[in-house]
């Protein structure tokens, strides 16, 4: 009898040890530094906008953080050390996702005004491919999101980072997105640094405070009403809802 107990005990300890090793191979919390590269020539087609763009300023590089744990994720811009004359041409929006309640709070920077949107996590139909690449030391698999006939996005995610999160609030893949790009390469995000940390509660929180909060449907209606008749309104609408 004691022999069976001993064997069972050894087996149990062995299984727990294996589970611990497997679990340690996956990252449940951390901080990712992203770089966003925007090609303004590809983003803006309006002739008036193009006149402001030249070889010296057509590429904008900006930084973002993705801070996450098992239950939430926050994607937010890194403040610029100094602004430049082209900074208004690219917006830094923030996204807080509660992975348990499946809710997302988005703060959009629209012409210097902050708009707060609370809605469910986006449900996107991804096509996962066999294509792989390494980003910041992690093997990533390529996935494709076909939003409509004119908008296709590519994501590279790793299952080594457990939370389903990524740049600009993108989620829905079996792991964390370390690379995201538009089909024409006009906007590209890549992870430059990955830190395995346990973030503080305040570091991963976004609060609307007393600001007015709308849902996605109400935001669409507001933008169409306020800017839909302007010559640049459609382009702004398309750019904004590329991510929403």
Show the residue positions of the predicted features.
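Bacterial Sec-dependent N-terminal signal peptides
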Residues: 1-32, 242-244
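Extended soluble regions of mature proteins
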Residues: 25-244
């Amino acid at each position: 009898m004691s022999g069976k107990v001993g064997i069972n005990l050894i087996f149990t300890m062995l299984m727990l040890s294996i589970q611990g090793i497997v679990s340690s191979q996956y990252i449940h919390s951390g901080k990712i530094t992203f770089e966003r590269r925007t090609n303004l020539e590809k983003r803006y087609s309006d002739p008036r906008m193009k006149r402001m763009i030249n070889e010296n300023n057509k590429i904008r590089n900006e930084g973002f953080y993705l801070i996450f744990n098992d239950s939430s994720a926050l994607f937010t811009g890194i403040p610029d050390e100094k602004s430049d004359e082209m900074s208004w041409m690219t917006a830094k929006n923030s996204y807080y996702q509660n992975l348990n309640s499946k809710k997302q709070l988005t703060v959009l920077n629209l012409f210097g005004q902050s708009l707060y949107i609370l809605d469910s996590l986006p449900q996107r139909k991804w096509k996962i491919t066999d294509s792989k690449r390494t980003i910041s030391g992690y093997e990533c698999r390529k996935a494709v999101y076909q939003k409509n006939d004119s908008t296709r996005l590519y994501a590279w995610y790793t299952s080594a980072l457990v939370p389903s999160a990524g740049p600009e609030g993108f989620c829905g893949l079996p792991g964390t997105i370390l690379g995201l790009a538009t089909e024409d390469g006009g906007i590209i995000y890549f992870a430059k640094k990955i830190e395995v940390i346990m973030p503080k509660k305040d570091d991963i929180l976004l609060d609307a405070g007393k600001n007015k909060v709308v849902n996605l449907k109400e935001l669409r209606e507001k933008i169409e009403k306020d800017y839909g008749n302007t010559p640049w309104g459609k382009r702004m609408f398309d750019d904004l809802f590329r991510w929403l």
